[in-house]
Amino acid sequence: MIEADRLIQPQLQGQDDVIDRAMRPKLLDEYTGQDDTRAQLKVFIQAAKNREEALDHMLIYGPPGLGKTTLAMIVANEMGVNIKSTSGPVLEKAGDLAALLTNLEAGDVLFIDEIHRLSPVVEEILYPAMEDYQLDIMIGEGPAARSIKLDLPPFTLVGATTRAGALTSPLRARFGIPLRLEFYNVKDLSTIVTRSAQVMGLAIDSEGATEIAKRSRGTPRIANRLLRRVRDYAEVKHDGAVTQKVAEQALDLLDVDGEGFDYMDRKLLLAIIDKFMGGPVGLDNLAAAIGEERETIEDVLEPFLIQQGFIQRTPRGRIATTRAYLHFGMIKPE
């Protein structure tokens, strides 16, 4: 099974982007969760508006699906300015970035998703633009080439990344506002599910929303995706309303268990428990045992299991924790 096949993957798939857009909150007061980040942003935005200045450059980082793009849109809405969106891989040449920068108006937000994937050439252009609101452009080629400086209006760069450590130090240092997004708790996710259901015109009770939230791996994008699949089940198998029982039946049918694990998560945990006596087991052996690439385990399967305390990463290899044994109704050997 590859990552794109998984219902509970946090990355965008299918029509996620179009549907997520319809459900996105527009203002900070509508945004649920990330309380510390929200409180900080309210202060920074109000201060910038009082001084009639562009907001400082902002780096939003954290696991995928937590609302980095949504937050960038909200910043633009709160500041009352336009937002232009792009992503690191799209900006292949310096001219691609220059075209975007020269079309910005004073105070506008430039949002670059996957900013850790910017090419070095494009990144070099970005430094003076961020620091001095200037664009250095080379005119001509060879010995006759010369550099000219263009003044840019004050703007706010909002960079988003799932891998803050992959940013170069010079780029990271130019962001005045670093914001880390954390996984959501069940209460906040339940609120998000309820709001999304209202947008969809779907009847859902609090227990139904909580059941979906519990299995959403702390991620709003997954919660909204599961909600859409539960709606399908409710309309076909029941009267269209989502209760706890309906949500449980639908998610069990989809093979998403009470912890938000799917077949691949359980396969990985059981391999450590059954084939390697709970570990420690090296990554290459584990990959061979479950028929997956080591990169898939490291980047896709492991992070959530480690974050939730089901796997422990040690110098000698991976170990299944007591919590992993309990999940399958087993007792961990002493």
From Swiss-Prot:
SS bonds (residue pairs): none
Ranges for region Small ATPAse domain (RuvB-S): 185-255
Entries under Pfam families matching the protein: AAA_lid_4 (PF17864), RuvB_C (PF05491), RuvB_N (PF05496)
Cell location: Cytoplasm
Annotated transmembrane regions: none
Documented EC number(s): 3.6.4.-
Region of interest (Large ATPase domain (RuvB-L)), residue spans: 4-184
Matching InterPro entries: AAA+_ATPase, AAA_lid_4, DNA_helicase_Holl-junc_RuvB, P-loop_NTPase, RuvB-like_N, RuvB_C, WH-like_DNA-bd_sf, WH_DNA-bd_sf
Binding residues annotated for ATP, in chain numbering: 24, 65, 68-70, 131-133, 174, 184, 221
A Gene Ontology biological process term: DNA repair
A GO term from the CC aspect: cytoplasm
Catalytic activity entry: ATP + H2O = ADP + phosphate + H(+)
Region (Head domain (RuvB-H)): 258-334
Keywords: ATP-binding, Cytoplasm, DNA damage, DNA recombination, DNA repair, DNA-binding, Hydrolase, Nucleotide-binding
Entry binding sites for DNA: 294, 313, 318
Main location: cytoplasm
Entry's Gene Ontology molecular function annotations: ATP binding; ATP hydrolysis activity; four-way junction DNA binding; four-way junction helicase activity
Source superkingdom: Bacteria
Role summary: The RuvA-RuvB-RuvC complex processes Holliday junction (HJ) DNA during genetic recombination and DNA repair, while the RuvA-RuvB complex plays an important role in the rescue of blocked DNA replication forks via replication fork reversal (RFR). RuvA specifically binds to HJ cruciform DNA, conferring on it an open structure. The RuvB hexamer acts as an ATP-dependent pump, pulling dsDNA into and through the RuvAB complex. RuvB forms 2 homohexamers on either side of HJ DNA bound by 1 or 2 RuvA tetramers; 4 subunits per hexamer contact DNA at a time.
Subunit: Homohexamer. Forms an RuvA(8)-RuvB(12)-Holliday junction (HJ) complex. HJ DNA is sandwiched between 2 RuvA tetramers; dsDNA enters through RuvA and exits via RuvB. An RuvB hexamer assembles on each DNA strand where it exits the tetramer. Each RuvB hexamer is contacted by two RuvA subunits (via domain III) on 2 adjacent RuvB subunits; this complex drives branch migration. In the full resolvosome a probable DNA-RuvA(4)-RuvB(12)-RuvC(2) complex forms which resolves the HJ.
Domain writeup: Has 3 domains, the large (RuvB-L) and small ATPase (RuvB-S) domains and the C-terminal head (RuvB-H) domain. The head domain binds DNA, while the ATPase domains jointly bind ATP, ADP or are empty depending on the state of the subunit in the translocation cycle. During a single DNA translocation step the structure of each domain remains the same, but their relative positions change.
Protein name (Swiss-Prot/TrEMBL): Holliday junction branch migration complex subunit RuvB
